């Protein structure tokens, strides 16, 4: 995985040039055919999902993103009667990689997830280079077969970084005010370092000298960062934001690189889409990034909302009209049977294993260290299928001595 440096905003040569590079040795017909999704299974419907992931989506939702590649999880969430192919295109801008390089340092949970996200991305690219696309990256023992989701994960190239920032301002549809941000917070946590209130009885000079000597220490840096998260409402930064809530907010400088990439993919790349659901959308867990991206007309969603788009074809960005006739009574709370809120997960699609209950007398004299661990044998846990309940609900009966779990990643559990 390579990190591409940020290009200058004053790069007029790139600005006036074509954003696509073509290989002179490759015919134009082959390039056009390669850009089109291949019809792997003729006769099946196809649906394209295009998402842009920033670092917060990986750091705070790495478990969810891994499930997108787990075939057992996909089988349980996608309607088995829907005969369709899903082309999931995941775009990782260079902004995400640079933020990984900053977040991955340390021993915090965010740093651990950032390193895990980098390893996960590397694993996917390694399997593509080795020609192992047929297997499940989350379950190497799975057998190749007809898949419901076809993946295309790629990293931003230098010619895809987007136009200059002065040109990006032409796409701005709204100038957000400070009061539109959650908790009036318009800056990232790293920009708020050192802005906690000065303790009583301590001068400004001594306080600043204390910060300068301790910020060289990584542990002191993290401690002050955590202190700002806890006492942000008592900080001078919060008081200034509260007093100027009606003023226009100022965008964090480094966020421009993400906005430029999103503008290029959504407005400049000029790809034809069959529906608004297929347009490029930014997946982020950061509320500050979401406000600024929406101000440029870029649809945003979190990781859970992205799962609704992938598995249920439900876009959270679609506007829903308010019906004034509703009185919020019990009758109004009922939803249509095909509503997204009525969908359930068929857990019987997960693999079952038999519950072994060894007797105490049998293993009483055995040494625990010499006991061999055997892999549990998979069984059919469904006893009867096709039953209906009193309300006409579909019911499946399971064996009492069988158990199944949601799919998890393979590997050994780390122990301190």
Curated annotation (Swiss-Prot):
**Locations listed in the record:** Cytoplasm
Tell me which Gene3D superfamilies the record gives.
5'-nuclease (3.40.50.1010)
Q: Name one GO biological process term.
A: nuclear-transcribed mRNA catabolic process, nonsense-mediated decay
Return the Basic and acidic residues bias intervals: 12-21
Assigned GO CC terms: cytoplasm
Assigned keywords, A-Z? Cytoplasm, Nonsense-mediated mRNA decay
Please classify the protein's predominant subcellular localization into one broad category: cytoplasm
Q: Name one Pfam family in it.
A: PIN_4
The reply to whether Cytoplasm figures as a keyword in the UniProt entry is yes
Superkingdom is Eukaryota
* InterPro entries listed in its UniProt record: PIN_dom
Q: Where is this region: Disordered?
A: 1-21, 195-218, 356-393
Q: Where is the composition biased (Basic residues)?
A: 360-375
Function, as annotated: Involved in nonsense-mediated decay of mRNAs containing premature stop codons.
Question: What's the protein name?
Answer: Nonsense-mediated decay protein 4
């Amino acid at each position: 995985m390579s990190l591409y440096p940020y290009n200058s905003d004053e790069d007029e040569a790139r600005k006036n040039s074509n954003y696509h590079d073509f290989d002179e040795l490759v015919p134009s017909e082959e390039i056009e055919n390669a850009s089109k999704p291949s019809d792997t299974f003729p006769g099946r419907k196809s649906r394209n999902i295009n998402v842009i992931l920033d670092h917060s989506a990986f750091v705070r939702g790495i478990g969810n993103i891994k499930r997108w590649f787990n075939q057992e999880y996909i089988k349980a969430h996608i309607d088995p009667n829907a005969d369709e192919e899903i082309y999931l295109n995941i775009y990782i801008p260079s902004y995400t990689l640079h933020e990984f390089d900053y977040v991955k340092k340390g021993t915090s949970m965010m740093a651990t997830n950032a390193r895990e996200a980098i390893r996960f991305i590397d694993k996917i690219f390694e399997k593509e280079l080795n020609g192992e696309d047929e297997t499940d990256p989350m379950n190497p023992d799975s057998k190749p077969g007809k898949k419901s989701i076809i993946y295309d994960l790629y990293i931003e190239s230098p010619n895809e970084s987007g136009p200059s920032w002065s040109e990006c301002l032409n796409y701005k549809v709204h100038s957000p005010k400070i009061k539109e941000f959650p908790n009036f917070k318009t800056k990232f946590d790293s920009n708020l370092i050192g802005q906690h209130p000065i303790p009583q009885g301590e001068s400004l000079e001594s306080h600043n000298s204390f910060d300068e000597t301790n910020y060289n220490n990584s542990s002191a840096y993290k401690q002050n960062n955590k202190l700002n998260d806890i006492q942000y409402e008592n900080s001078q930064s919060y008081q200034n934001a509260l007093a100027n809530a009606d003023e226009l907010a100022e965008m964090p400088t480094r966020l421009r690189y993400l906005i430029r990439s999103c503008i290029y993919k959504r407005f400049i790349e000029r790809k034809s889409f069959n529906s608004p659901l297929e347009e490029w959308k930014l997946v982020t867990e950061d509320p500050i990034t979401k406000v600024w991206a929406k101000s440029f007309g870029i649809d945003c969603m979190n990781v859970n909302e992205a799962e609704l788009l992938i598995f249920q074809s439900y876009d959270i960005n679609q506007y829903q009209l308010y019906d004034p006739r509703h009185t919020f009574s019990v009758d109004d709370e009922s939803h249509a049977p095909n509503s997204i809120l009525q969908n359930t997960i068929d857990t019987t699609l997960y693999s079952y294993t038999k519950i072994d209950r060894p007797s105490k007398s049998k293993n009483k004299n055995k040494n625990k260290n010499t006991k061999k661990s055997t892999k549990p044998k998979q069984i059919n846990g469904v006893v009867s299928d096709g039953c209906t309940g009193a309300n006409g609900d579909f019911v499946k009966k399971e064996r009492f001595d069988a158990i199944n779990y949601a799919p998890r990643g393979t590997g050994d559990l780390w122990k301190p």
